[in-house]
Every structure is written in structure tokens, then in C-alpha cells.
């Protein structure tokens, strides 16, 4: 067989990524050889494949759910925003330039349709089933002409479409109906039904509404997934991380030692790969929060400056907010600070940037003996090394080239006192290294904190992916879902007026 399915959504963050991952995990547990696919992703959270290609981190997570190695075929187009109006375009894993939204939708996007269809065809020729994820909503009528990720690809590849709606936000029935009613007759023929996500309460109270929706649209609901905490793994962007103060705390479990460890993550502009701190949040006794005010660093045992798509912009933001001076005071007092990728670069002496911000010479915070020069060629690699006596694996995604002139070696970067810096994303996912690093932080902070010996980040990730598979298996109509994947959308689905505007 060469089955396929497109998971569309009524909105962004409706749950498309986790539903796609859940279906992949459910299928692979049934012995189906399955792969994920997203034609075009807009995200600052990315991943480096074994062949050195950059793809959306959500697709890497979905590949893990499918128990296959992620490749550039699974996300041929990645857009990495640099501002509200422009993005870096990554094609088949390599950056090909910056482009404005108007320029992209004005012609470039449409020209990429052949590329993404070729990638999808290659995957469908290799796997039993390909589960595709859409983007935003398929009913963005102003963008339909150049769409290559929702109905544009569904029409060309004849994929059945399942629309996911987040009922926790309210208005899910109007969203379901409106999504279908704004599609053309040809697009509507592929929309097979709906999947309710994040439901709280008694499903029997929802069922009359689902029956009414079926009567109105001629399309069934394929399941009601209950709301579950802790399943927003590898989010595509910072949608859930407001930049207004301490707004996102990890759910801390009981510490092994006497004290908890508090981690403050600076919520810098254009945060990228902030999933780096997920491994810290997974440790019992470690609480992680995102902050944007200097006073919020006062009780933090560790401050993390994460990656960013705008290093110079992040420096300006840190200075404007008074965080730069707070970081200098921390460093002088021997209190731990960790910079990762762009966060590492801001800790250096100066930056020469004629590529990203085109600001030329910019002074850094001066906390590490590092000089950074931005190169047009992006570094995309998966390094392996050792630090603090432990094996470490990571991945690098950056234009900045660091010249380290002093300090103690730390991965590819350095350490001076209690200030660490590295380009390596994902290093904290190495369990032994993470525990050794947290012991160093606890000692410097004077905390009686003991890392849990048995915490496996990879194991916890597998448990989360299994929970996603369980959600599909237990709360979706899997027989109907399998028929949809295998045979496509049923014929004779009714047209819901008014349809797409002329």
C-alpha cells in the first residue's frame, strides 16, 4: 500500500503536530512502516539530521514517533523568521536566502510546489503510509493560490484531510464548519471529517454537538482526544512562551536532595531551540521558568540565555531591559550563567555581523573571551565530545564563528568561573553530562541539590510519544482512520456553501 493522510487544523496550535506524531506512533505499533511529512514549516525550533540538513524539530520528533531516522525529505521547506516580515528560507536542509513575506507568497512559494510533491512522492514510494501535517489553517483564503502545505498539496497528491480543532479555546464547532465552508468544492471533496482535541469533561455532553456537525457537513468526527498535560513536546515556535515575565514554569517533581534548583531562561527575541531546557525541566527538583526582568534573576540558581535567530537584537534587548547588567553582576559574584548558541555569542567580547543583522561591529557582554564573526555559510553538524568527564552529543545550527581566546575548554566554547558558553544545542539531553553540570551549578549556588541518578531524557521522550499513540488508539476511531489512510476520502461528500470566494 501507499497510504496517506493530511492533518489540517482550524488554527495554529490546534494540535496538528502532536496528532501527527500520535498517529505515527499508533501505526508503527501496528507494524506499519510510516513516515511524517510537512511540506513547509515556519519555526525557530529546528534540528540537524545525520546528513547535515536542517529541518523543523517537530518533524524530527514525529520521525522518532515513527521510529525512523529524520531526513530533509520530511520537511523540504523551513522558514525561520528574522522579523515580522521576513524569514530565512531553508530548502532541502540548506539556507538559500532571506525573503520577505510578500516576496515569498508573490511567487517563490508556488515555484516550490514541485519540490515538495517530489519529496512526498519519494516518501510514499518508500513507506506504507505518510502522515502529513498542514500549517495554520487550510482556510486562509488570501493565501490559497500559493498554498503548498495544506489543500494545495492535498489536491495534488489526492490526500484525504482530517481537520483538528482545539475545543479548549472554545468555538470549535464554528471553526470546524467555517473551515470547510470557506474551501472550494474541489478542496471540500478531500475533507473527510474532524478530530476534537483537548477536551475536558464528560464526552456525552459533547456528542449532540458532534451529531449536529455531521448533519450540517455530512462529515463524521473521528474522535475526541482528552486534554492531557505535558504533551506539548518540541513545539514549533514560541507561541506558548509569552515574553511578559515569568509565565512558563515546568511542573517540578520532588527533589532527591534537600533543595530544588531554580533555572531562569531569558526570553530573548526570536528564541530558537528553547527546547534545550526541556531536559533540565525533566529533572526531579529542577523548576524552569522564562523571564524578562532583572529582578527575576535574583533567586535563580542558573540563568540560561538560549539560542536566537537575532543575536544582535537579543543583545539590545538584554541591555534595554537591564538584564545585561544583572548578568554581569551574576558573573562577578560567581553565580552560574549558561549561554547556548546565540546565547553563547552574546556573552563574548564583540560580534562582527554583516550577515544576520548587518550591523557590523557590535560589543558583546564581555563575560567570555570570545570573538564572533558571522559567516554566510551556516554551520550544520552533529558533534560528539566530552565535558565534565561525561560523553556529550549535540547539534549545531549557526552562522556565527567563534574565536575562543581563553578560559577553560567547554565543548566547543569555554568556561570562565561560573559562566559557560557553547554552540551545542541538545547537549543537556546527554544524561550523564546534564547531571554533572547540575552538580556544578548546585555547588556554585550553595544548594543541597542532588540530580536523580535514573533520569533518562530519551526514556521520558519515548514515554511521551507512547502516550500520544495511546491517545489515538484509545480515543480515536482507529478502524475509520485506517480506512481513510488506506483508501482516501469517501466519495460523495457534500459541498458546504458558500465555498471559497471567487
UniProtKB/Swiss-Prot annotation:
Entry superkingdom: Bacteria
One term of GO molecular function: catalytic activity
Transmembrane segments: none
Entry-linked PROSITE patterns: GATASE_COBBQ
Gene Ontology biological process: cobalamin biosynthetic process
Active site per UniProt: 341, 425
Pathway: Cofactor biosynthesis; adenosylcobalamin biosynthesis
Annotated keywords: Cobalamin biosynthesis, Glutamine amidotransferase
Keyword flag Zinc: no
Domain GATase cobBQ-type: 260-433
Function, in words: Catalyzes amidations at positions B, D, E, and G on adenosylcobyrinic A,C-diamide. NH(2) groups are provided by glutamine, and one molecule of ATP is hydrogenolyzed for each amidation.
PANTHER family per the UniProt record, alphabetical: COBYRIC ACID SYNTHASE, DETHIOBIOTIN SYNTHETASE
Family: Belongs to the CobB/CobQ family. CobQ subfamily.
Name recorded for this polypeptide: Cobyric acid synthase
Gene: cobQ
Amino acid at each position: 500500500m501507499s497510504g496517506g493522510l493530511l492533518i489540517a487544523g482550524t488554527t495554529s496550535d490546534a494540535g496538528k503536530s502532536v496528532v501527527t506524531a500520535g498517529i505515527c506512533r499508533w501505526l508503527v505499533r501496528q507494524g506499519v512502516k510510516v513516515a511524517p511529512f510537512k511540506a513547509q514549516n515556519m519555526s525557530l525550533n529546528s534540528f540537524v539530521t545525520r546528513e547535515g540538513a536542517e529541518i523543523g524539530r517537530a518533524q524530527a520528533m514525529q520521525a522518532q514517533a515513527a521510529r525512523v531516522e529524520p531526513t530533509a525529505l520530511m520537511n523540504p521547506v523551513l522558514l525561520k523568521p528574522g522579523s515580522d516580515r521576513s524569514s530565512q528560507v531553508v530548502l532541502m536542509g540548506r539556507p538559500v536566502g532571506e525573503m520577505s513575506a510578500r516576496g515569498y507568497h508573490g511567487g517563490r512559494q508556488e515555484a516550490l510546489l514541485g519540490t515538495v510533491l517530489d519529496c512526498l512522492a519519494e516518501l510514499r514510494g518508500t513507506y506504507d503510509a505518510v502522515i502529513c501535517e498542514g500549517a495554520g489553517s487550510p482556510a486562509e483564503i488570501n493565501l490559497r493560490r500559493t498554498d503548498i502545505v495544506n489543500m494545495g498539496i492535498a489536491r495534488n497528491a489526492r490526500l484525504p484531510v482530517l481537520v483538528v480543532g482545539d475545543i479548549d479555546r472554545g468555538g470549535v464547532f464554528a471553526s470546524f464548519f467555517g473551515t470547510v465552508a470557506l474551501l472550494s468544492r474541489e478542496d471540500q471533496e478531500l475533507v473527510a471529517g474532524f478530530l476534537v482535541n483537548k477536551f475536558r469533561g464528560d464526552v456525552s455532553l459533547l456528542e449532540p454537538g458532534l451529531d449536529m456537525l455531521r448533519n450540517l457537513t455530512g462529515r463524521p468526527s473521528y474522535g475526541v482526544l482528552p486534554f492531557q498535560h505535558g504533551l506539548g513536546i518540541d513545539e514549533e515556535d514560541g507561541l506558548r512562551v509569552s515574553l511578559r515575565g515569568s509565565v512558563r514554569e515546568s511542573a517540578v517533581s520532588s527533589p532527591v536532595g534537600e533543595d530544588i534548583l531554580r533555572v531562569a531562561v531569558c526570553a530573548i527575541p526570536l528564541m530558537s531551540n528553547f527546547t534545550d531546557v526541556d531536559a533540565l525541566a525533566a529533572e526531579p527538583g529542577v523548576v524552569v521558568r522564562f523571564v524578562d526582568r532583572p529582578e527575576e534573576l535574583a533567586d535563580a540558581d542558573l540563568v540560561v540565555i538560549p539560542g536566537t535567530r537575532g543575536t544582535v537584537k537579543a543583545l539590545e534587548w538584554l541591555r534595554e531591559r537591564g538584564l545585561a547588567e544583572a548578568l554581569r553582576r551574576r558573573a562577578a559574584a560567581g553565580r552560574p550563567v549558561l549561554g547556548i548558541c546565540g546565547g553563547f555569542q552574546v556573552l563574548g567580547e564583540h560580534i562582527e555581523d554583516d550577515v544576520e543583522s548587518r550591523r557590523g561591529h557590535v560589543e558583546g557582554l564581555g563575560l567570555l573571551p570570545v570573538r564572533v564573526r558571522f559567516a554566510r555559510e551556516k554551520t550544520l553538524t552533529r558533534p560528539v565530545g566530552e565535558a565534565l568527564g561525561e560523553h556529550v552529543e549535540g547539534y549545531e545550527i549557526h552562522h556565527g564563528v567563534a574565536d575562543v581566546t581563553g578560559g577553560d575548554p567547554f565543548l566547543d566554547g569555554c568556561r570562565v568561573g561560573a559562566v559557560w558558553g557553547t554552540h551545542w544545542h541538545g547537549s543537556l539531553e546527554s544524561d550523564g553530562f546534564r547531571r554533572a553540570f547540575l552538580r556544578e551549578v548546585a555547588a556554585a549556588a550553595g544548594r543541597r541539590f542532588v540530580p536523580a541518578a535514573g533520569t533518562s531524557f530519551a526514556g521520558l521522550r519515548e514515554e511521551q510519544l507512547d502516550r500520544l499513540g495511546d491517545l489515538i488508539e484509545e480515543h480515536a476511531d482507529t478502524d475509520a482512520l485506517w480506512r481513510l489512510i488506506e483508501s482516501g476520502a469517501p466519495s460523495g461528500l457534500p459541498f458546504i456553501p458558500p465555498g471559497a470566494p471567487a
